[in-house]
């Protein structure tokens, strides 16, 4: 889908291309030094929607020079068997990062699987240790969607120090990490959720408004401060007047774009950057793994000298 040529739209494509270009340079250097980056994608069962994501991840990984391999498991597999497979990948030095594709069958806890991934191979930034590290301003392995959302806000050129930010939605992998990422940049952050008494009152005073709740067109123009930046992270399927399904966000873009100075389109905003962040995280993970390897066994130069 082509997006209108409107300066108010914060388009993710150009940002993603920039990130992937940098990753491609780093990956080429790592390969030349004998450390080729490799991603393993884990899919459980047959889900068409997952296949779309995997194809996109594979294509972008190839573009960045990162090896990508998919491991498929039957929907009948037990949680214990999957965890054992993940532990095997954790122990494989050829594997840089592990991706758990969602959804998984109801009898399996995706949180349990994510916790089974070693933090050094957690390129999605969803291991409890990775999320916890954000509190301590260790930000380079943050959850991909959260990091992508903040990346788009930075595209506005707004000074984040002291910026009044409101985050609508407080999930463990999007809303909460966004809040901590922004606080680390010096922003003043308010988080709204289903128990917040007046989301509109909070939203109207935000210089930057992030929305991730999964409710189509929740945010209307009268809830947005004039001149604000609006980052729409929602992805919802909606039946249009012609009976066809279309993707819309949590923001009523048609009305809000006339109030906000910047707004992310859905699709085409946060989404493209999310995969780019995944690839950038892969190189961060590889760097950490190499540092551990060299601390344990020494660098190639040191080993040769010995």
Swiss-Prot record:
Single GO molecular function: methenyltetrahydrofolate cyclohydrolase activity
Superkingdom classification of source: Bacteria
Alphabetical keyword list: Amino-acid biosynthesis, Histidine biosynthesis, Hydrolase, Methionine biosynthesis, Multifunctional enzyme, NADP, One-carbon metabolism, Oxidoreductase, Purine biosynthesis
Stored SUPFAM superfamilies: Aminoacid dehydrogenase-like, N-terminal domain, NAD(P)-binding Rossmann-fold domains
GO terms classed as biological process: L-histidine biosynthetic process; methionine biosynthetic process; purine nucleotide biosynthetic process; tetrahydrofolate interconversion
Reactions catalysed: (6R)-5,10-methylene-5,6,7,8-tetrahydrofolate + NADP(+) = (6R)-5,10-methenyltetrahydrofolate + NADPH; (6R)-5,10-methenyltetrahydrofolate + H2O = (6R)-10-formyltetrahydrofolate + H(+)
Enzyme Commission designation: 1.5.1.5, 3.5.4.9
InterPro entries reported for this sequence: Aminoacid_DH-like_N_sf, NAD(P)-bd_dom_sf, THF_DH/CycHdrlase, THF_DH/CycHdrlase_cat_dom, THF_DH/CycHdrlase_CS, THF_DH/CycHdrlase_NAD-bd_dom
Pathway(s) served: One-carbon metabolism; tetrahydrofolate interconversion
Protein purpose: Catalyzes the oxidation of 5,10-methylenetetrahydrofolate to 5,10-methenyltetrahydrofolate and then the hydrolysis of 5,10-methenyltetrahydrofolate to 10-formyltetrahydrofolate.
Family (UniProt): Belongs to the tetrahydrofolate dehydrogenase/cyclohydrolase family.
Quaternary structure and partners: Homodimer.
Protein known as: Bifunctional protein FolD 2
Organism, scientific name: Mesorhizobium japonicum (strain LMG 29417 / CECT 9101 / MAFF 303099)
Gene, per the UniProt record: folD2
